[in-house]
Amino acid sequence: AYDSAEVILTIFERYDTFREIYYHGIGYASKEALTRIDKYLNIPAMADYITSTRVPVDDVRVKFEEMNQPLDKIQALFTSVEDRDAARKEIEEVPGIEITGALPMNLEINAAGVNKGKAMIELGKVLGIPREEIMAFGDGNNDLKMLKEVGTGVAMENAIPSLKEAADYVTLSNDEEGVAKFIEKYVLD
């Protein structure tokens, strides 16, 4: 809801963060922050992706207030794990949300019930594929609910430890073509 998003944005603003808001699948970030994204993200390919796909705005807070409607997602990149963890602790008090993160120093906030796992199950319903026949692969914290939700959850060898523990299987790493090897062995053979 709009009120929850306003609270979360306020929390993120208290920390040194790169903030993004999403409406209808489009991400908005501050022009100024986009020019110094490397302060928050030391993965050049990901930084390039973000700077090339986000709509630059003068101020994220102003854009949020102008839109004046519920958003898809709020994301923040932090400069320290301590700040990320402190912000997460504050945000956990906000009702009706899901907290995740694909990167070591980020938090992604969605409405409760909005996650990759639910999306895959809904797509399966549309396509006539039962949950038991849906397989998903993941490596990060943002994949945890997905691997638990689907019929077969597979973690990559390079996945975070908690994801490996939750998965039904662990395959080779991304660099070793783990997804392809797993499908060849367990699906195609």
Region roles according to the model:
Residues 5-7, 11, 15-18, 22-137, ...:
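Conserved acidic, metal-coordinating active-site core of Asp-based
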Residues 92, 107-189:
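Mg2+-dependent phosphoryl-transfer enzymes with acidic/Ser/Thr/Gly-rich catalytic loops
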Residues 1-3:
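Glycine/small-residue-rich loop that forms an oxyanion/phosphate-binding "nest" at active or ligand-binding sites
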